[in-house]
Amino acid sequence: MENKDSLQFHMNMGKLISSVHNMITRRFVQNAHEAGLDISLDQWMVLGPIHYHGDASQKLLSDFCFKDKTSITRIVNTLEKKNLVVRVPDQLDHRVNRVILTTAGKQLFNDVLPIMNKTKKEVSRDIAESDIEIFKDVLTKIISNLENE
């Protein structure tokens, strides 16, 4: 019986988390496209830490975005092809590339901010801020539980 309950818990929780992620992603892309912007949520999530830090190593991006190095490389390659970022060698460690926003990347970041805020408002409509904080705390604890194994 315990195995059945565990499976049911995993399927319900995993399905809910996956569904929420997919729906938020679709809404963000829809809002961005309606505004005439060509950017995915993954690309936006990579632009954020680069903008915040001024530049970022691909390792930092991987850690920040909870994505493997291969996924980050693919996203950065796409952003580079769109002329939104450039890679430059780190001044102290030439084995490391720093990713920097171009002028077009900075402009896109600023153009997307209102879209992200709109999406955030749509996602959290009629949900108390305290409930959002509890939800984030629970998800953070789940992440911590799984990272510490």
Region spans (language model):
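C-terminal regulatory/oligomerization modules of transcriptional regulators
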Residues: M1-S6, E129-E149
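Charged, amphipathic alpha-helical coiled-coil/dimerization segments
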Residues: N77-D137
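N-terminal leader segment of winged-helix/HTH proteins
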Residues: M1-A35
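Alpha-helical linker/hinge and terminal dimerization helices associated
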Residues: V20, I24-R27, N31, C65, ...
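Residue-level marker of regulatory loop/turn positions in helix-turn-helix DNA-binding domains and
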Residues: F9, I39, M116
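N-terminal helix-turn-helix DNA-binding core of bacterial DNA-binding proteins
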Residues: N22, R26-T70
